[in-house]
């Protein structure tokens, strides 16, 4: 499944935590980000294998493994083999740092998710809910303004 969503934000940026993007890829791309990414990222593997490099360390990423990258941390990641399916979320907010401290993600880190099914269910709910958020500007109903030709 390759699916993603980047909401158009307005007042949401005043919230303590907000999603900037969320998605899933059948085959993750090869990314080299010398200046890092501008927002917090959490990426986890659902199938296949990948490799990530940050802070001078290299890690193999397998199903159930995840990594957190704070903003502006230089990194590189890429698939190993033909399949590397990932799910990812990017976020910000004035309480993002406190939330991350609470779950012990204070710096770039690779970790294993013990209950991948529970995390995947939450991920799918967030993706669904993000798609329900109206876009800005809202689409206008033009059905009542159609003119008839004589």
Feature names for model-found ranges:
Residues 99-150:
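Amphipathic alpha-helical segments enriched in hydrophobic/aromatic residues interleaved with Lys/Arg
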Residues 62, 97-98:
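DNA-contacting interfaces and partner/effector-binding or oligomerization modules
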Residues 20, 86-91, 140-142:
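Short glycine/serine/threonine-enriched helix-capping/active-site loop
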Residues 1-60, 65, 81, 103-110:
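Generic protein-terminus/edge-of-domain signal
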Residues 71-95:
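Ligand-binding loop in jelly-roll beta-barrel domains
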Residues 23, 90-92, 114:
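Residues at the C-termini of beta-strands that transition into short coil/loop
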